[in-house]
Regions:
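Iron-sulfur-cluster electron-transfer modules
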Residues: 39-108, 116-119, 133
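C-terminal helical cap(s) of enzyme catalytic domains, especially alpha/beta-barrels
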Residues: 146-162, 300-318, 365, 376-401
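Flanking helices and flexible, charged tails adjoining ferredoxin-like Fe-S electron-transfer domains
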Residues: 1-6, 74-95, 394-402, 406-421, ...
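Glycine-rich beta-alpha junction loops
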Residues: 74, 117, 141-143, 204, ...
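Iron-sulfur cluster-binding cysteine motifs and their immediate structural context
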Residues: 19-44, 59-86, 363, 441-459, ...
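Ferredoxin-like iron-sulfur electron-transfer modules
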Residues: 2-23, 48-62, 419-438, 452-470, ...
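N-terminal capping/small domains of soluble enzymes
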Residues: 91-196, 202-206, 388
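Alpha/beta enzyme core
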Residues: 126-131, 135, 203-349, 357-362, ...
Length: 494
């Protein structure tokens, strides 16, 4: 593998992998390695965790039957090249602790399933907990049982990634209240060391109180009040509540009246200032916040039928959007709340676009003590927890941390208002001539979307210093990572 493009090729090849279940490449390995698991770890930003899953020395002399077994429709994944070229090392993490307290309750790790279809039956939750998830927030339930539509999902695609964003039309649980309570009871009995959270939704104060009481009686650890589902078919439920401060306050009080365990208020992002309903929740007795729920959306229009997605007998409706695309929105709301003088003292369970250990720890660095995941599980399965746990432990070890709690809030001081940013210095981009392939992408973007600070000839791109403002658009669009940052210097005349 050509060294100067090695990291880029490894990334491209691992993203090409279809991440098969019961993968043929692993079955074909004569040495007992798990190449599918190896590739998956790299895909989920855990290359050091991949180290123990194959032996580069053995693989270097192997004829790679794993590659011949690959079922990819457009050529085999270069498994052997990736294994023998990866810069990684074994890191012992035996003394790293992922345990953390959340809302006064100890969790073996902060990684939870969020309230959705991925946590909607006993068997599903049990499978997830067996694989290592620290807890589950069971699919929202109440006295109201909805009818669901078909189909109920659509996606926003980008190149060959089908899940940049994900839209759903699902509502609350379609099981009876008795069934849901029975499942929660079994889960807590069979998994006493895991955190079981009941997500509830009532139509009036009496229902909120009753649901809280019944949930505590079956042994759940925490109650989450769902004030934020954006696609409820019934008025006065879901995000309609989360946008109404009076209802938020009344329903939190009603929930607290029915139980003695911690209560979280789940916030809607379909509002300008999340601090307002969050403060109303806390002042009414909530013990913490969960954020964010999904963003109201339309994912697209079929320009031949003029139907939107997902099409339900020719129609659709505005509903919740999730996945990687909403992560920046979630991080912004988390930051707003954790910088609030009152809210910063209360625990937040972070939700929105989390796929990897790195995503999860970004939420924690901005103040979350806990995170929740749905869309990534729908796309890749519960197995993503393996690299969340491994990757987080390796990161903590490399950083010299003993406990994951040391990361919480670490990034907050680096986020300031725009008027406090340094405007007296600049970082100019530098083109790596060895890596540059002269494709001209930087030139096009700089000329048409920047400051006309790149000249282009047969020799490739050249930065025009007098025009460059250091915006770094060129660096971000370069397809081979051939543009780097230079040393920060004072602006001319400053």
């Amino acid at each position: 593998m050509e060294n100067k493009y090695k990291d880029k090729i490894i990334k491209t090849e691992t993203f090409k992998c279809m991440l098969c279940h019961n993968a043929a490449c692993t079955k074909a390995c004569p040495n007992g390695f798990d190449p599918a698991r190896f590739i998956r770890s790299i895909r989920f930003e855990n290359k050091d965790g991949a180290y123990d899953m194959a032996d580069a020395k053995i693989c270097a002399t192997c004829n790679a039957p794993c590659e011949n077994a690959c079922i990819h429709y457009d050529g085999k994944i270069r498994i052997k090249d990736i294994i023998t070229s990866l810069d990684a090392k074994k890191i012992d993490t035996y003394d790293v602790d992922l345990g953390i307290d959340f809302a006064g309750i100890h969790c073996i790790n902060p990684f939870f399933l969020s309230s959705s279809v991925v946590a909607s039956t006993y068997e599903m939750c049990a499978k997830a907990l067996d694989m290592g998830w620290g807890g589950i927030v069971f699919k929202t339930f109440g006295y109201y049982i909805p009818d669901e539509v078909s189909p109920r999902f659509s996606t926003l695609e980008k190149e060959d990634n089908p899940f940049v964003g994900f839209k759903n039309l699902e509502q609350t649980s379609t099981h009876s209240l008795e069934e849901n309570l029975s499942i929660l009871k079994r889960l807590k009995e069979n998994y006493p060391d895991r955190i079981i959270v009941a997500s509830i939704m009532g139509e009036n104060e009496e229902e909120w109180t009753s649901l809280a009481k019944l949930s505590e009686e079956v042994g759940v650890d925490i109650i989450e009040c769902n004030f934020s589902c954006p696609q409820m078919a019934k008025n006065g439920m879901g995000s309609d509540v989360g946008q109404n401060i009076d209802l938020v306050s009344r329903y939190v009080k009603a929930t607290k009246a029915g139980c003695s365990i911690p209560v979280l208020a789940k916030m809607t992002p379909n509002i300008g200032n999340m601090e307002v309903p969050a403060l109303a929740s806390i002042s009414s007795g909530a013990d913490g916040i969960a954020a964010i729920n999904t963003v109201k959306s339309i994912t697209g229009v079929d320009l031949y039928s003029f139907e939107s997605y997902p099409t339900v007998a020719g129609k659709t409706s505005i509903s919740g959007y999730s996945g990687k695309a909403v992560k920046p929105i979630a991080l912004r709301f988390i930051t707003d709340m954790k910088k609030n003088e009152t809210l910063k003292n209360y625990p937040i369970s972070g939700i929105g676009g989390i796929e990897t250990w790195q995503d999860a720890l970004e939420f924690m660095a901005l103040g979350c003590e806990n995170i929740q995941v749905t869309t990534a599980v729908m796309q890749y399965g519960y197995r993503i927890i393996e690299d969340m746990i491994s990757g987080a432990k390796i990161y903590l070890k490399k950083m010299g941390y003993k406990s994951i709690s040391e990361v919480v809030g670490k990034a907050l001081d680096q986020i300031v208002s725009a008027d406090h940013l340094d405007r007296s210095t600049v970082e100019f981009p530098v083109i790596d001539k060895e890596k540059c392939i002269k494709c001209g992408r930087c030139y096009l973007s700089c000329y048409d979307g920047g400051h006309q600070a790149i000249d282009f000839s047969d020799d490739g791109p050249k930065i025009i210093g007098k025009n460059c403002v250091g915006c770094h658009l060129c660096r971000l669009v370069c397809p081979v990572d051939a543009i780097n940052k230079s040393k920060r210097i004072k602006k001319v005349g400053r």
